[in-house]
Amino acid sequence: MLEKTCLEEKLDQQCSNVDNIKHTNVDIFKNESNSTVVSIPPKHSIRARKPSLHFLHSFASSGSLTYKNALRHKSCKLHLHKCKNPKKKYRQSGFRLASKGIPRSRCSKKAKKYLEDKKLMPISEVSLDPVISSNPLLRWWATSASNDSLLEELNNRFEQITNAWVQVSKDEAQNFVHKTEYTKGDHCEAASPLETCLLELEVSPVKMLFQKKYNLNELCTWFMQTTETQSLSLVRKANARNPLEVISTKGIKLGVKCCGFNASPFRKHFKKFAVSSPSKPAGKFHILHKMVGSPLLNVKSNLTLARLKRTEFKNLHCERWRREERPYSHRTVDWSSKRRNLRLFCQNPSWTNSEGQTNAETSLNGKGTVGNQWASPPEPRVTFAKKRVAVHDFRTHASLESKFNGTGGGQTDSEKEQIMESVSSHNWRSKTLKDCRIFLRKINCLEHRNTFKLNTIIYSPESVDSGGSQAQPEESKRFSLRSHSARQNSFKKQNEERANPKANSPASSRLTGELDSSHLSKHVNFDKNPDHSEALSKLSKRKRPPWKTTEMSAKRHKRQSCNSGQMANYCTKSQVGKLFSPSF
């Protein structure tokens, strides 16, 4: 619609321009009739005012089919009208000039000049011919024409084209042969080799296509049958594909047996195109997961699964078995879960509070604090009975401490037991106990080597030197837990104390007598034997096994750190068992 409106506007502009030219010419001739001198306009201005033939040709050919005929008629009318106008004007001007009594010679001269000027403009001669010739071969159909009429006209044209071709049917070929023989007999014409070749063709394929109705499917089938469409690259890609994607497992019989992957029909293709074949295609595992629950898995002689049953299918079955077994299995926890539990164990506020309270309580017992050493047992599993024994041992030691320390110690021990029981009853399980053992084993690198005596306690020099009534009962209580080097040091210090009778009290002498009767009778009686230095040297010169030497070096390191005042807090095995024991 926009094109139509534009064309109409252009035509109106051209027509208005032509009318303006007419009016200007009429006014000029009127003025000339009034005046004696005829003013003829210049050539270029007149040519510029008139529409050009190139514009009309392009304008007529650019429109739609329905508007071409209208443009052709309009262009013809315009040119004919322009040709008639100058003739009429010339006659009118000549008639007016003659009527006014102007001499004939002057009129004739002016008329000749005007005609010469008009001869320079050939548009009047060209405009007589139409812009678009009405050729009967070119036919334009309107948009309202039906499809049936168009098909009929097309069929007629195809028939005309086919009739113009050389006929190659049998009857026509025989007639053509007779004609050639007749011409040869007369020796007038000779048969051309092209015509003899046409005789050999019975039916032309192009003629066959145009004689029948147009059908795209027939053309496609004919093209696919008569041409080579598969290239080498397509065949190579098809061979390099995964057999799981190409072959469907539905049509495989159960009785078919395959020797193996090396004897399979795909072996040569995988060897030939090993670079182009993908190692792990995208849809491979998706197909395998779909086929896990199918009955074809039980068939060991499957063609497509012969190669995959060694690796992928075993893994898939193992995954299924693990998923089914996981809620019923009672196996050890992974190290990641242990680390997670250990982190929670270290961040637990109840554990930190209990640890601070135990350290405070041990500091109240005397000037020298008994170190709390975290000792991890070497065995991976500790039964419930062992935990109870450790807790009972801790309680007996706590009762002994309360006897010698007085009422304050008893109160602290009772508070400690209540706190420990609350912690153990609410917060600890067997898993956390195992995780804590692993954690303690990694922290205590020195105690990790000591697999025999993990419950040893080394006293600080202040606690050993204290001559009160608290240190000696603790020594009598925990004397059996000391190592050999610690015993030697304690014997030396006890002998020094006995040599000074002023410093020793009667209670301490009684306790030392009990200690001599109970513990020192097995080794050497240092009170009766004056040569105690010789006995100590003999004990030190004994031959020790290699594990004992490593243990002694560790103990020596601890003793040096204890003497320098850098000893860390330690706790015994019984205390650790008390902390992690479940509620009774």
UniProtKB/Swiss-Prot annotation:
Region annotation Disordered: where it falls in the sequence: 353-379, 400-426, 463-565
Biased composition (Polar residues): 353-375, 502-511
Domain of life where this protein originates: Eukaryota
Residue stretches of biased makeup (Basic and acidic residues): 516-535
Pfam families, per database record: DUF4553 (PF15090)
Signal sequence region: none
Residue ranges the record marks as coiled coil: none
Cited InterPro entries: DUF4553 (IPR028104)
Family matches, as PANTHER family: GENE 340-RELATED, LIGAND DEPENDENT NUCLEAR RECEPTOR COREPRESSOR LIKE
Protein name: Putative uncharacterized protein ENSP00000382790 homolog
UniProt source species: Mus musculus
Underlying gene: Gm3414
